[in-house]
């Protein structure tokens, strides 16, 4: 096993390339998504192995609703299957399941399963697995600002406007207690952030790989971690 002196506390991955992976094999796109979810299980075990505390994955974006209805229905079924059959395994490994994103457009039964999974695993403390479903970075910021407005945080006792601070917005994000991603990996050779963790990624390091998500394995993870270990994170400052 490779050992690292510096490990990201929060690793995030854009799970990209499932459809193209399936197409190259002459299979339906949903076969790629199914294989991608299987790989999520394998990668989660690696997260524990390498001592990464927070692991978030971009599973379904706010823009993914524009995909064909059959594909969306298939993805929702896969999410149900994952929660029904894999949550107990994650919990047994010390993992806490959490979700980020809006829930008003998701099927009611899926939302119920998500809430139950969060409740069942809330006392696990080895690592957090964060599934971003119906998540969009812009939407998250809008929701945070609207929460501040509806909560009266933008009005003082005299009725005058009170400026919003970074701390205010941070405290109203979907998961305000989760640290910002240290390293964001995007698979499949695309070079875009795609609306993922927009607020939280201001000083995240990025690692891009041509490998499709279903083929992402331990060797690829090690490459990303080695790259991260060699980064000089200055956060806008300079070395003395």
Regions from the PLM with identified roles:
Residues 1-240:
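Flexible, compositionally biased loop and terminal segments
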